[in-house]
Amino acid sequence: QTNVSLKSLINDQFSIDDLQITTKEIKLNDIIALVGIFQNSPQLFILDTFVRDGFVTANINLNFDEKGNIKENYKIEGAVKKAKLNILNQFKLQNLNFNFNINKSSHSLKRLDMMLNNIKITSPSIEIEKNKNSFFVNGQFLQGKKNFNIEELKLIFDNLFNNIDIQKIEFSSKNNFSFNVNKKFKFDN
């Protein structure tokens, strides 16, 4: 959907004031390839190597100036569903689902849930604020109750449980986090 200025049409100027795009479900890899055509970057290449599967839907609102340039008040809202990522063969994210809101200065991820190396993790919200030379990331991870057999933990904690008569342990966690990351994805803080 778009609005066209009659005055601009008559004066033979760029005539689109705003543009609203609503997508159907699109494969994440197809979106990454499409964005790569217009804005190729090392970060996009890295993302493409991590993403194995998944879908995105989006509502995109763009406003244009008289010259046809996109104004900085754009808004992108949508959802990622059933995403799978393999990060350096160490971290396997499966069934990654979240809603997102993106504008010039911030990115917001809501109702995130995923399996990370077969452990279910959720997050009510992760906020990413764009600063001059970095991004400030702030959020919370929740891990629901997880039962561990003592034999599974012995592999990690070695001899810690040898003299204790415990068969199973139940864990749950709530972790708040925040950090700065620069534009080359190096942690500053």
Descriptions of predicted regions:
Residues T2-V4, F55-N61, N95-N97, K120-S123, ...:
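Short small/polar-residue motifs
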Residues Q1-L9, L96, H107, L112:
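N-terminal beta-strand/beta-hairpin edge segment
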Residues T2-K7, L28-A33, N118-I126, N147-E151:
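A short, polar/proline- and glycine-enriched secondary-structure boundary/capping micro-motif
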Residues D113-M114, E127:
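A short beta-strand motif that forms part of the nucleic acid-binding face
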Residues I10, E129-N131:
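Short, ordered beta-strand-loop transition motifs
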